[in-house]
Regions:
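Sequence periodicity and composition characteristic of long alpha-helical coiled-coils
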Residues: 1-26, 167
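Hinge-like oligomerization/junction regions that interrupt long coiled-coil arms in large cytoskeletal
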Residues: 20-167
Length: 167
C-alpha cells in the first residue's frame, strides 16, 4: 500500500509535448521574472459536460494552440515580444474582448490559491472565446459543441477520437 501511495505521489500530471524552443522560452521567462500560467493547468471542465464533449473540447483547444498557451498579464507584452531569437511560444494576454456565449459555460477556473486577479484574468480569457453552435458564433474565436473551431481566419475540425487528459 505504501509503495502504491508513493508511486501516485511521484507521478507527474501529463503535459503536452513542447518543442525545445518553447521549453527554452519558458526558462527565459522565469529567469526574467515574467509570471505566466499554462492555460490547461488552471481550468477544469464543468461537471455538466459528458466525457465525449470534454474530449472534443480539449482536442479543439489543442488544435487551436490554446491548450498549452501561456496566460500572461498585458503589462508584460512588450517584454515577451522582445525576447531573444531562437525561442517561440503561444500567448494569451488578459486584455481581450468578450463574446456573449463563451467558454465560461463549460470551463471553470481552478483557483486553489484564491487569487482574485488571476481568477479575473482567466475569466476574461474564457469569455473571449465563443462556445455553442457554429451558426450562433460571430466572434473571431470559438468552439462549437462538436469540437469544430475557429481562431481568427482559420477554422478546423477534430478527429472525435481524442481522449482528454490534460484538463
Amino acid at each position: 500500500l505504501n509503495a502504491e501511495l508513493e508511486s501516485w505521489n511521484n507521478k507527474k500530471d501529463p503535459e503536452p509535448e513542447q518543442p525545445e524552443c518553447v521549453r527554452q522560452n519558458r526558462r527565459r521567462l522565469k529567469e526574467q521574472g515574467i509570471p505566466y500560467q499554462q492555460f490547461y493547468k488552471i481550468i477544469e471542465f464543468d461537471t455538466g459536460l459528458t466525457r465525449e464533449q470534454a474530449d472534443r473540447i480539449e482536442e479543439a483547444l489543442m488544435n487551436m494552440g490554446v491548450l498549452d498557451a501561456l496566460i500572461i498579464s498585458e503589462e508584460y507584452r512588450e517584454q515577451v515580444y522582445s525576447l531573444d531569437p531562437g525561442v517561440c511560444d503561444k500567448y494569451i494576454f488578459s486584455d481581450v474582448s468578450h463574446v456573449k456565449e463563451n467558454l465560461t459555460q463549460i470551463l471553470d477556473v481552478d483557483n486553489g490559491e484564491q487569487d482574485i486577479l488571476l481568477y479575473h484574468s482567466i475569466s476574461n480569457i474564457l469569455s473571449a472565446i465563443g462556445f455553442g453552435s457554429r451558426e450562433e458564433q460571430s466572434g473571431h474565436s470559438w468552439i462549437d459543441r462538436e469540437g469544430n473551431y475557429r481562431i481568427g481566419v482559420l477554422e478546423g475540425t477534430v478527429t472525435k477520437e481524442y481522449k482528454a487528459r490534460f484538463i
